[in-house]
């Protein structure tokens, strides 16, 4: 069943209808329209926890989409799925790829920082102080980038940077 028919959330339905209208009036290619439909279906599946279906849709959208900016969001969402599945190394790869295409994507910087922070906590639990410090320092650098791009966001990260003395470290 197409994802469109499964969607019963009013806001999602409204977004879908508006997106379809915009796609009809904007001068876009058939591939761009198809890519957007796959991307939209991927987001819908992802929001329902249907990660395998979401990945299928995202990979198809990626195959069709040529615009680097739009590709960055598709790749970023693929990273989100891998992170949700605990595949942090793979998630990092996709977040970095999204930043190569769109270096002004604060959420990718934030999610990279979250993974490094998590790895720092795990290393601290194992009493591996060198690894813990290294991971926390990496997290700090990525959070600084996220905060630079979106200064009103990531308040918890800002507080962590302040309390750990990493806010002004270069």
Swiss-Prot record:
Domain of life: Eukaryota
Segments annotated as TPR repeats: 35-68, 72-105, 120-153
SUPFAM superfamilies: TPR-like
Subcellular localization: Plastid, Chloroplast thylakoid membrane
Record has Nucleotidyltransferase as a keyword: no
Signal peptide location: none
Membrane topology according to the record: Peripheral membrane protein
Purpose of the protein: Essential for the assembly of the photosystem I (PSI) complex. May act as a chaperone-like factor to guide the assembly of the PSI subunits.
Protein name as catalogued: Photosystem I assembly protein Ycf3
């Amino acid at each position: 069943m197409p994802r469109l028919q499964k969607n019963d959330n009013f806001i999602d339905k409204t977004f879908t209808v508006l997106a379809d209208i915009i796609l009809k009036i904007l001068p876009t290619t058939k591939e761009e329209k198809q890519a957007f439909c796959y991307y939209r279906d991927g987001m819908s599946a992802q929001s329902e926890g249907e990660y395998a279906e979401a990945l299928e849709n995202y990979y198809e959208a990626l195959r069709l989409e040529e615009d680097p900016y739009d590709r960055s969001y598709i790749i970023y969402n693929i990273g989100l799925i891998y992170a949700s599945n605990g595949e942090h190394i793979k998630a990092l790869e996709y977040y970095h790829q999204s930043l190569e295409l769109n270096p002004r994507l604060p959420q990718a910087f934030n999610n990279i920082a979250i993974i490094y922070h998590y790895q720092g906590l795990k290393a601290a639990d194992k009493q591996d102080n060198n690894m813990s410090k290294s991971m926390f320092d990496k997290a700090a650098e990525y959070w600084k980038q996220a905060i630079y791009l979106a200064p009103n966001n990531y308040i918890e990260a800002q507080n962590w940077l302040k309390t750990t003395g990493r806010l002004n470290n270069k």
